[in-house]
């Protein structure tokens, strides 16, 4: 069963910027996001405390935060950033 993947604008902008600076990191993140379409909760993913329904995967020094909507088989990538900035970005996007 495949899930559709939707990437919010801010996460997409981060990936575009990263692909110009560090191509291999951007490719690894994009591969990990594509993998979420087949396995939305891969080994090593973690639910985020204080954020109901939001999951996190690590890709090197980067974090991908996303939601899974089982009713429509959708993975929504909310934010992608470095470890030290991803949680601030997540709070901004969720208005917390």
Ranges and model annotations:
Residues 1-30:
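Arg/Lys-rich, positively charged N-terminal/basic patches that mediate binding to nucleic acids
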Residues 4, 23-24, 59, 67-96:
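Enriched for short, Lys/Arg-rich terminal
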Residues 10, 53, 85:
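Residue-level recognition of oxygen-bearing side chains
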Residues 14, 32-35, 47, 76-79, ...:
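Residue-level recognition of specific faces of alpha-helices
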Residues 19-20, 34, 41, 91-95:
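A generic structural signal for secondary-structure junctions
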Residues 31-57:
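A short, surface-exposed loop/turn module that caps and links secondary-structure elements
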